[in-house]
Amino acid sequence: MSSKLLTIQLLEELVHAAELNQEGKTADYIPELANVNQELTAIAVQPLGEKTLAYSNNPLHPVTLQSTGKMIPLIGLLEEFGADQLFEWVKVEPSGDDFASITRLEQFGPKPSNPMLNAGAIALCSRIPGVGEQQFRWLEHWVQKLFNQRLSINPLVFASEKRTGNRNRALAYLLKSRNNLGADVHETLDLYFALCSYEAMLDQMLYLPAVLANRGQDPDTGEQILSIETCKITLAIMATCGLYDETGTHMVKTGMPAKSGVSGYTIAVVPGKAGIVVLSPRVNAKGNSIRGEIMLEGLSKAMGWHFALP
C-alpha cells in the first residue's frame, strides 16, 4: 500500500534527501560530460491518468541521453524485425561486467550478452536498415516516435564521443572479426555516437517510460505506439540488465525496471502505474547516478511501487 500521495512536496523531499549525498562525480572520460552542474538533482513522474509532477533543485537544461538512448535501437528493431531475429544478433542475459567490457565479449561472444551493454547497442546499430543517410533517418523516425517529438544531437558531445571512443571502436572491430557486425565499422559507430549524443529536457524523457508503463499506449490519447510484446520484452531487459552490474541492487531496492546513462539520466517504469525520470550527473564507477538511485528508492518506498509488493 502507498504510504503517501504523489505530490510536489514528496518529490521535493526526495530531491533534498538525495542532495545530502556528495558521492560520485560527473563522467569525465567524455570531456563534454564533465561540463555540467554536478549539483543538479531532479525528478519527474507521469502517473497514468494524472498530470505530470516534477521538481528540480536547479534550472534545467538539455542533457544527452547517453546509454538511455540504447532503448531506441532495441525497441525499433523489436518492432520491425521481431524478437526471434533480434535474439540472433544479441543475447538477453545479465553480464555481471561493466558496460564497456571487452573481455566479456571475447569470452562469451560473438553475441553480446545484452542490448544494454555498449557491445550490444553497437551490434544493434549495425542492424539498422538502410545505408548512410537512410540509417540516420531511421534513427530520427524512432526518436520522434519514442519521445513524441524531435530531439537534437549535441554536436560537441558527438565530436567528443568520436574523439575519445577508442574502446567502442575496439568492441566494434571485435564484433566485426566475429562476424556479428551487420555494417561498416565507421558507419555503425557514427550511428552509435549519434544515439548517445541526442539531448533532451527532463520532461521530454518522460514519454517513453510512460508509454512502457501503459502497455505501449500513448498516456494521453490511448494510441497504440508500441506492441504489448515489445513492451514486455523491453521491460524484462530493463529489469535484468538496465543498470549493468548494479541491476540486481537496483531491483532489490526499487523494484522498478530502469535504464541508466552516464549523463545522469535514469528512466524507470512502474507497469500500469507510472513513468519516471530522475537526473543527477554524479555517477558512480559503474556509470549509474547515485542521487538518481536514492530518489528512485525513496519514491518506490513512499508509493509502494516495488514490483514484488502485492
From Swiss-Prot:
Instruction: Provide the catalytic activity annotation.
Output: L-glutamine + H2O = L-glutamate + NH4(+)
A GO molecular function term, named singly, is:
glutaminase activity
Gene3D superfamilies to which the protein is assigned, alphabetical: DD-peptidase/beta-lactamase superfamily
- The source's superkingdom equals Bacteria
- One example of a Gene Ontology biological process annotation: glutamate biosynthetic process
Q: Where does substrate bind?
A: S67, N118, E161, N168, Y192, Y244, V262
Which family is annotated? Belongs to the glutaminase family.
Cite the PANTHER family for this sequence: GLUTAMINASE
Q: What protein name applies here?
A: Glutaminase
User: Species name for this entry?
Assistant: Legionella pneumophila (strain Corby)
